[in-house]
UniProtKB/Swiss-Prot annotation:
It comes from Bos taurus. InterPro entries: Sushi/SCR/CCP_sf, Sushi_SCR_CCP_dom. Residues 1-17 form the signal peptide. This is C4b-binding protein beta chain. Keywords: Complement pathway, Disulfide bond, Glycoprotein, Immunity, Innate immunity, Repeat, Secreted, Signal, Sushi. Controls the classical pathway of complement activation. It binds as a cofactor to C3b/C4b inactivator (C3bINA), which then hydrolyzes the complement fragment C4b. It also accelerates the degradation of the C4bC2a complex (C3 convertase) by dissociating the complement fragment C2a. It also interacts with serum amyloid P component.
Amino acid sequence: MFFWLMCYLVDVWLISASDVGHCPDPLLVTDEFSSLEPVNVNDTFMFKCNEHCIFKGSNWSQCRENHTRVTHSPVSKSRDCGPPETPTHGYFEGRDFKSGSTITYYCEARYRLVGTQHQQCIDGEWTSAPPICELIQEAPKPAELELEKAFLAFQESKELCKAIKKFTQRLKKSDLTMEKVKYSLERKKAKLKAKMLL
């Protein structure tokens, strides 16, 4: 005998039967099964889902003489996707997570997107892993580079008076004031504190 099982994440319909022994009712994993009649030995039955759900596994099975099925029951799931992951320091735009819908990822200021920006929901799964938002490393400014050189010259000198003299000469040469030095040091301090908190 041959059966058709129609599923809508909950409902399954059984058609036709014979009189010899019975197999356990076919189950759609994660769903409930309602059968109109028992499944008998040598009966073949097929699973079929409505358009808004899909199943993974074989779409048919048969009841054997030892009252087991030829194949395992399929797993049924919605074609729609769950909410996507939100990357740290980022967000996505799109509120529809139905099959065929698309979302777009963005990053906060000072971060860049690494990975796929646009993702689509296809048969209950997003097309790729969520992207990440990576901090953009700022290139040092010329004044900061000159300040670094001045600090290195200060550290290399073994005599304090000579070190201070070299340091101030470098500052004057690069047109740096003590106010700019102070500001640069405060920025470095803030960056170090931020790194320590991560």
